[in-house]
């Protein structure tokens, strides 16, 4: 089976493990975009420790779950968003103000919509979590 969108696959694996009440999830296959997205989730307290395991076939991430994710998912298609439009996308994907984050890929790296608003930069929407 060919997986076309590794980020979507990883986020759905996390969502399914949270629903089942698991304490950790193994994400495979992986890439740098998945790692940077997981780091954003870790910075905001949605996931715990992230451990990389090199198995000789591309590697795996073992992610500790904290049980704080109500919903997580990819944003497809990956919409380009300007700095001034971030609030509109917040209203579309997040349940309320100050609840959850949007993950945005910018020219300065992968970050949350909160950081992007502080730095006044836009980017491409990758995922939402709350």
From Swiss-Prot:
Q: Name one GO cellular component term.
A: ribonucleoprotein complex
Tell me the superkingdom of the source: Archaea
| Cross-referenced PROSITE patterns | RIBOSOMAL_S8
Q: Name one GO molecular function term.
A: rRNA binding
Instruction: Give a GO biological-process term.
Output: translation
Which UniProt keywords are given for this protein, alphabetically ordered?
Ribonucleoprotein, Ribosomal protein, RNA-binding, rRNA-binding
This protein's record includes keyword Lyase = no
Subunit field text: Part of the 30S ribosomal subunit.
Q: Record's PANTHER family?
A: 40S RIBOSOMAL PROTEIN S15A (PTHR11758)
The family classification in the record reads:
Belongs to the universal ribosomal protein uS8 family.
Function comment: One of the primary rRNA binding proteins, it binds directly to 16S rRNA central domain where it helps coordinate assembly of the platform of the 30S subunit.
Q: What is this protein called?
A: Small ribosomal subunit protein uS8
Question: Which organism does this record belong to?
Answer: Pyrobaculum islandicum (strain DSM 4184 / JCM 9189 / GEO3)
